[in-house]
Amino acid sequence: MPRFESKGLCDQLRRAVVSIPSNIAEGAGRSSTLEFSHFLDIAKGSCNEIDTQILIAKNIGYIDEGYYNTLLHKIQHVSSQLYKLIKTVRTE
């Protein structure tokens, strides 16, 4: 991405990426499954945010279709794993 985006889209993307494991860790340290589930939902929301941000990056020409598809596949995999974890935690 262009250097001038280091404070824009890149920064937003970086925060969303860091948010996923951070929220999982914070939720795991909470005292109830309800709280854990809440933080997993936040992490899942960050996956959706990343999905949107990489689409924007592709649409404005910062990344090509191939790299977009690679990133999309990875974030969809993370999102799917989180969804399964959320279902498991909520049935406990």
Language model features with spans:
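Amphipathic alpha-helical assembly/interaction segments
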Residues: M1-E92
